Design a protein with these regions (language model features):
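Glycine/tyrosine- and acidic-biased, solvent-exposed loop/turn segments at the edges of beta-strands
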Residues: 1-162
Length: 162
């Protein structure tokens, strides 16, 4: 008597595709629309900050702390303007070290990058965008993630935060 063998399942020859993250939530417009970041107005920055070019501000001998005149280590908001009076960047300092948001702008006024510092070290999330608004670099130090993309939104690097 002949016994018919049971059919076997085909062996999959394709590997499962790795799911790539959706970069849309990292676009500048999406981040700003959903108020993920707080960006200060130029008026606020100028009213409450010090223009880097107008003050005698410099580094200490070890180039580690930021100082202001003979008053010692600087605490406050420093900003830079371009030749046309447009805001180029601003950053908060505490006791001579970056402490708080640092934001840099393109000449068009669009945000180039955003990062947060604590005691001179980048903490949390770092965003860098192309001028077209797509994410260039995203580093999440809390969840140890890093994504880099080209100007068309294609991921070029993905892995752990440095």
């Amino acid at each position: 008597m002949f016994i018919k063998p049971k059919p076997t399942k085909p062996i999959p020859t394709e590997q499962k595709e790795i799911r790539k993250p959706d970069l849309k939530p990292l676009s500048r417009d999406h981040v700003l629309e959903h108020k993920t970041l707080k960006i200060l107005s130029m008026e606020y920055v100028i009213e409450h900050g010090i223009d880097y070019e107008d003050e005698e501000i410099g580094w200490d001998e070890q180039y580690y702390h930021f100082i202001c005149n003979s008053e010692g280590y600087f605490t406050g908001l420093i900003y830079k303007l371009d030749d046309n009076g447009n805001l180029m960047s601003y950053v908060f300092y505490k006791d001579g070290l970056k402490d708080g948001a640092e934001v840099e702008f393109y000449p068009s006024g669009k945000i180039h990058y955003y990062s947060v510092y604590r005691k001179g070290e980048i903490t949390g999330i770092f965003y860098e965008w192309y001028e077209n608004g797509l994410i260039k670099k995203y580093i999440d130090r809390i969840h140890d993630k890093r994504i880099e993309a080209d100007e068309q939104g294609k991921i070029t690097k993905q892995g752990k935060a440095d």
